[in-house]
């Protein structure tokens, strides 16, 4: 849907996902999702007579990293709610890259996922559009917290700790595995994105904008609206965000979503050896420090 198609009755934008998604689904049920017949535009194309700018003139380098293989079938949709949070399982579609560049139709994905009894996959597509309309209506959120009071947070922004996070050397296995996957493949499992982002903002007290920028430089499926929306969600300063006192415990997250350490061992070759780094911060102390900083900012 376009930016003004799914709004409140008074024409203002939704800033909470649940009522937005309900209105979105109402609109969907009343509207037949049709494909745009792009072939009709072929007759309107024109051949340029003058030489166009060569792509080599831009500061663009070819990557040797192969994008993740698309995994979109009925089983992925049906089992998405069950499998989407387990990084060792190939339970996500990997379609983010194609949605970003328009090589897959959002309409075809909506039609296919809407046929399933399990709507979890469809809800994720709605989240994508929710963040898009937020960025449209509130463009200042590219660099500012949606909730302005969170601008008062006194970030530590320790660059040595930031570099350890970037390199996957924090001493927290699930965090390090995620960052190493990102650096090597240009992709990171969504559950692990939340864990790594939360760790940067809450454990290290590093400004979400710094982490968002790093993800933007690495992710093949980077979309500004989703990236900013999710980083602000994790930091607690965005629309419909997690409360600031929700701080992921990396060890509990690993126990829950990578109990057998399959994902961790895949990306950390030196795991469980003396070569693996010590924790750069104590979880309990980091949690207490974070809560204090946030309370001071919002009080």
Model-predicted segments: where are they?
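Generic structural motif recognizing short loop/turn segments at the entrances and edges of beta-strands
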Residues: 2-3, 12-13, 227-229, 244, ...
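Short clusters of hydrophobic/aromatic residues that line enzyme substrate/ligand-binding pockets
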Residues: 7, 17, 80, 155, ...
């Amino acid at each position: 849907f376009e930016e003004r198609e799914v709004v409140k009755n008074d024409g203002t934008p939704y800033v909470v996902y649940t009522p937005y998604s309900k209105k979105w689904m109402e609109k969907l049920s009343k509207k037949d999702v049709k494909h745009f017949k792009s072939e009709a535009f072929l007759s309107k194309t024109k051949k340029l007579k003058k030489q166009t700018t060569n792509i080599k003139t831009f500061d663009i380098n070819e990557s040797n990293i192969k994008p993740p293989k698309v995994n979109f079938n009925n089983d992925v949709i049906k089992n998405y709610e069950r499998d989407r949070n387990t990084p060792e399982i190939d339970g996500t579609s990997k379609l983010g890259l194609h949605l970003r560049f328009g090589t897959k139709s959002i309409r075809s994905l909506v039609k296919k996922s809407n046929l399933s009894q399990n709507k979890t996959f469809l809800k994720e597509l709605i989240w994508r559009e929710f963040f898009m309309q937020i960025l449209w209506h509130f463009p200042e959120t590219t660099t500012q917290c949606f909730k302005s009071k969170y601008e008062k947070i006194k970030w530590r922004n320790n660059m040595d700790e930031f570099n350890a996070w970037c390199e996957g050397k924090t001493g927290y296995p699930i965090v390090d595995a995620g960052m190493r996957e990102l650096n090597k493949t240009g992709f990171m499992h969504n559950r692990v994105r939340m864990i790594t982002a939360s760790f940067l903002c809450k454990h290290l007290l590093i400004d979400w904008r710094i982490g968002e920028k790093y993800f933007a430089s690495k992710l093949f499926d980077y979309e500004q609206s989703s990236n900013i929306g999710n980083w602000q969600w994790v930091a607690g300063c965005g629309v419909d965000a997690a409360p600031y006192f929700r701080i992921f415990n990396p060890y509990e997250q690993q126990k829950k979503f990578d109990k057998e350490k399959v994902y961790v061992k895949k990306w950390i070759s030196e795991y469980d050896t003396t070569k693996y780094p010590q924790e750069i911060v104590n979880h309990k102390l980091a949690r207490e420090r974070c809560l204090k900083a946030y309370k001071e900012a919002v009080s």
